[in-house]
A protein has these predicted regions:
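N-terminal leader/targeting and accessory segments in enzymes
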Residues: 1-95, 272, 301, 415, ...
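ATP-dependent carboxylate-amine ligase
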Residues: 1-21, 44, 53-55, 131, ...
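Phosphate-binding loop of NTP-binding sites
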Residues: 95-237, 241, 245-258, 310, ...
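Short loop/edge segments at beta-strand edges and connector loops
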Residues: 73, 87, 142, 184, ...
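Acidic, Mg2+-coordinating active-site environments of NTP-dependent enzymes
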Residues: 77-80, 175, 190, 200-349, ...
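Short internal beta-strands
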Residues: 69-74, 237-242, 379-380, 404-411
Length: 491
């Protein structure tokens, strides 16, 4: 389906959201076949959006030379060119993208998830239930993949930029799919990628300090307020009772959502879980509401995944799906790089994407409970130029829970990975024999597995199935923790 945007529609949409300041040199009517913010993708007649910290006026000049008919910006850059001047160019891009694609989100059952940890796993619990109940693959946007009915593609952002996001919604409809489950990052709201998106369901999983830094959020309060926006932009709000700042989250949901459900571990919740039994693999647990009790089984390890599963059950029940389909859909979910357990000759390797305080804490506590007495080794690092407090938190947690730590590179960016490792080592503690710094991640994974003894557990944390490292502004190939572990174990 070909999409177009006329000047009258564009200006009307921007005025409706209070964004349009003026439209100098614009004729009465002007069709814009393409909409883009990439000067390299401009076609004749395009509307070009000047957005982003890296925008330079020469990008606009290139766009105009390539045939752009109009540009959108917060200030005039070219006095002769038609322009739509707006108060917030990122919001304007979201508004124009939705208008350009015909507001496809309004025709979807759109499920959005936010939280500091567990978004990806819960996304796939929900998706698998929907796939089972509906009898076909439903759409998903996650840190693992983007699937809208065509080919599944790798994702590099938790939540796509607004123009790509609206295209995903439109592609989903074009493939005859009516359900889409997606992760909604705090950055997605901060950068207005999901501005104006009407979610059918919004889930708030949990909250702890993360993504604080000069390139992300200036404070924890900013991080929290961005995540809170999902509760203000959904019809059904679902909240996990154990999250920090629960009362504020609940109040925001009650003020804006048509319906609010709470799930957790006690009977004060709308749905709660009890009677947890360890299985091999996974867990069986009982989900209760005021009128019923029902057993469910998951095969994923990690007790924290019971909370993720309960959230998925709460949402899909509220959407009217039968318990039998929910139980079948949730029973055998596996997410690449999330609690992937590999065992050989009495040795256990766990590949997990744990990368912040909340996820490391939950992972360590779960393993201590499910593998009592087993020595725990961990291989981990921290990314460059992002959330510097992670280095403190993860260092302290490794010092508290791990018997030995392999410190290595994890998307170092423009920083020296060895220096990041040395900084983390300073927080592990005074027992210097308990860690080693090996900046080459592939070599570190190989060595950690070679040194793993029967009865010991090794956590490969932070990268999961990702087959790249972010280095010096590039995506350098990396075999992935999961692939190296399988190779070294002969699996």
């Amino acid at each position: 389906m070909e999409h177009t945007l006329t000047l009258s529609r564009a200006t009307a949409a921007l005025r409706q959201h209070g964004l349009l300041l003026s439209a100098p040199h614009c004729p009465q009517e002007l069709p814009f076949p393409p909409l883009t913010y990439d000067s390299r993708a401009v076609a004749p007649g395009a509307i070009f959006v000047c957005k982003g910290l890296n925008f330079k006026p020469e990008y606009l000049q290139k766009a105009l030379e390539a045939g752009a008919a109009c540009y959108v910006a917060e200030q005039p850059y070219n006095n002769a060119a038609p322009a739509l001047l707006v108060s917030d160019v990122r919001r304007a891009l979201s508004v124009l993208a939705a208008e350009y694609y015909g507001h496809p989100a309004e025709q979807l059952t759109l499920i959005g998830l936010t939280g500091t940890k567990g978004k990806t796993t819960t996304t796939y619990f929900i998706k698998n239930i929907l796939d089972t109940a509906l009898g076909h693959r439903t759409a998903v946007l996650s840190t693992v993949e983007m699937y809208t009915g065509g080919e599944s593609t790798e994702a590099h952002l938790t939540t796509p930029e607004s123009l790509e996001l609206q295209q995903c919604f439109a592609d989903t409809l074009a493939h005859g799919i009516r359900h889409l489950t997606m992760e909604v990052s705090s950055q997605a709201y901060k950068q207005q990628r999901v501005y104006g998106v009407p979610f059918t369901v919004g889930l708030f999983l949990n909250l702890s300090e993360d993504h604080i830094g000069p390139l992300e959020h200036e404070s924890f309060e900013d991080y929290f307020q961005c995540k809170l926006q999902l509760m203000k932009n959904c019809k059904l709000a679902v909240i996990c009772r154990g999250t920090d700042r629960f009362e504020e989250i609940y109040a925001a949901a009650k003020a804006h959502a048509e319906r609010v459900l709470v799930c957790g571990n006690d009977p004060s919740c709308d749905l709660w879980v009890e009677n947890i039994r360890k299985e091999t693999p996974g867990f069986t647990f009982t989900v209760c509401d005021k009128n019923s009790r029902r057993d469910f089984r998951i095969t994923m390890e990690g007790r924290f995944n019971i909370e993720n599963a309960l959230a998925a059950i709460t949402i899909t029940r509220a959407l009217g799906l039968p318990d039998d389909a929910i139980a079948a859909g949730i029973a055998d979910v596996s997410v690449p790089g999330r609690m992937n357990v590999l065992q050989k000759d009495g040795r256990t390797v766990i590949v997990d994407y744990a990368h912040n305080f909340l996820s490391f804490t939950a992972l360590f506590r779960s393993l201590k409970q499910d593998y009592p007495g087993a020595p725990i080794k961990v291989l981990c690092g921290c990314p460059g130029h992002k959330n510097l407090k992670r280095r403190v938190d993860i260092g302290h947690l490794c010092g508290e829970y791990a018997d030995f730590v392999y410190l290595t590179a994890e998307d170092p960016g423009f920083e020296d990975p060895a220096e990041i490792c040395r900084e983390m080592a300073g927080y592990i503690g005074e027992s210097h024999h308990r860690f080693i710094i090996l900046p080459d991640r592939a070599a570190a994974v190989e060595r950690s597995i070679a040194e793993l003894a029967p009865g010991e557990i090794l956590i490969l944390a932070g990268k999961g199935e990702e087959d790249y490292q972010k280095v010096q502004g590039r995506y350098d190939f990396y075999e992935s923790d999961l692939a190296i572990a399988r190779r070294c174990l002969g699996l």
